[in-house]
């Protein structure tokens, strides 16, 4: 769920508050439209697509609880998660790891969505 995703982000990117990722680019934090503006925004587009795929499986990705572990910046989804929990955990894990590897460009935070995301 979104609370667990926030905690996963904190695991992989402890130096930056989670909410910095909630209004970034064209895909981080809102529906998503247009071409991703950078690598971090592309991480969010992939995450959105992953949630969409989980939804098509009959899952509720924003609310599905799952089990995972964070150890020294490394995330692991619990192998005993059910079908939906496993799918959503994997979406969040991949995104949190992607965030950790992508540069954060301050100018791409809180952009003019209507102008830049067509």
UniProtKB/Swiss-Prot annotation:
Reported tissue expression: Expressed by the venom gland.
CDD domains referenced in this protein's UniProt entry, alphabetically: PLA2c (cd00125)
UniProt keyword Transferase, yes or no: no
Disulfide pairings: 11-70, 26-117, 28-44, 43-98, 50-91, 59-84, 77-89
The keyword Lipid metabolism is assigned to this record: yes
GO molecular function: calcium ion binding; calcium-dependent phospholipase A2 activity; phospholipid binding; toxin activity
EC number(s) given by UniProt: 3.1.1.4
Residues the record marks as active site: 47, 92
SUPFAM superfamilies: Phospholipase A2, PLA2
Organism superkingdom: Eukaryota
InterPro entries: PLipase_A2, PLipase_A2_Asp_AS, PLipase_A2_dom, PLipase_A2_dom_sf, PLipase_A2_His_AS
Chemical reaction(s) catalysed: a 1,2-diacyl-sn-glycero-3-phosphocholine + H2O = a 1-acyl-sn-glycero-3-phosphocholine + a fatty acid + H(+)
Sequence positions that bind Ca(2+): 27, 29, 31, 48
Cofactor binding comment, as recorded: Binds 1 Ca(2+) ion.
Broad enzyme group: hydrolase
Task of the protein: Snake venom phospholipase A2 (PLA2) that shows anticoagulant activity, has cytotoxic activity and affects neuromuscular transmission in vitro. PLA2 catalyzes the calcium-dependent hydrolysis of the 2-acyl groups in 3-sn-phosphoglycerides.
Name this polypeptide is given: Basic phospholipase A2 nigexine
